[in-house]
């Protein structure tokens, strides 16, 4: 890599670490640097199913250690900074009427000052539902700003906003202003968690666990960075080196990341064909086999016509030539009202006739 290239940070997660171990690591890092970012917290905790109480306990620990939360890992982060006042749509997103109306509506809501935020939080403690609504409405822009980061992950922009709003509501209910965090700092975690979980649950035809979605997203970022650095598609070994993963694990993640393709996908310039039209049905007969089978049936019918009616019918029942179900000697005997031994004799005589060269040569070509 050239000197001008930003080295991709390796964020490895030891699967043997417990939740408390990871929290301890984060707190030690926060003490050393004075802050932690929402991104690195989310990345480190992605493999654990954390409930709201556990997350609140962690925020308490951060507060007790004077560790602040920031929205970006560092100044070299290429992600767009969160800007709650920016209500424009992200690049590539078509603004339809519902989205435009929603953005216009929340744009009319005034942002809160720090003092107003505290006053609302105090009222919420007293069970004031109006204060809850006011705090949530004032932070709807924050949800839009965060939702922009997840466009292109398989969910519509408006759906991302809706899921983020659910996280915002949870943050409003759990927020404790006495801990010293700004509400936006606290809410960012819950909004992001709600959106990422929704993407994992809804964005794919086949559901992928949240922690695997995060791994896939990280792998894609590494893959894109290496593509820029190397000028070619990176090998699994090169991706694995950046992520501290075995090449085999990288291949497994890449395989999981593949999206199913619909058999109804249009094919061709006129979109008059579908992908399913070009996929062979492994269980269906090939045209050549079908043609050979039909010819064999015709020849077999001609050969059977040379037998007596009783001989022909006995063979049809014994070998299931009409319905595919073979019968025992006893079953055929009951049909004709004779003994099983008599049926055996009729069958043997009929087969001897079929073995005669005058008849067998007509079927011999189908025996190859």
Swiss-Prot record:
A Gene Ontology molecular function term of the record: DNA binding
Main location class: cytoplasm
Biased composition (Basic and acidic residues): 71-83
Disordered, as annotated region: 69-90
Top-level taxon of origin: Bacteria
Region of interest (Sigma-70 factor domain-4), residue spans: 303-356
UniProt DNA-binding region: 329-348
Region (Sigma-70 factor domain-2) residue spans: 135-205
Keyword Transcription in annotation: yes
Keywords associated with the record: Cytoplasm, DNA-binding, Sigma factor, Transcription, Transcription regulation
Places the protein is found: Cytoplasm
InterPro entries for the chain: RNA_pol_sigma-70_dom (IPR014284), RNA_pol_sigma70 (IPR000943), RNA_pol_sigma70_r1_2 (IPR009042), RNA_pol_sigma70_r2 (IPR007627), RNA_pol_sigma70_r3 (IPR007624), RNA_pol_sigma70_r4 (IPR007630), RNA_pol_sigma_70_r1_1 (IPR007127), RNA_pol_sigma_70_r1_1_sf (IPR042189)
GO cellular component: a single term: cytoplasm
Family assignment from sequence similarity: Belongs to the sigma-70 factor family. RpoD/SigA subfamily.
Its job: Sigma factors are initiation factors that promote the attachment of RNA polymerase to specific initiation sites and are then released. This sigma factor is the primary sigma factor during exponential growth.
Subunit structure comment from the entry: Interacts transiently with the RNA polymerase catalytic core.
NCBIfam families: PRK09210.1, RpoD_Cterm, sigma70-ECF
UniProt-recorded name of the protein: RNA polymerase sigma factor SigA
Gene: sigA
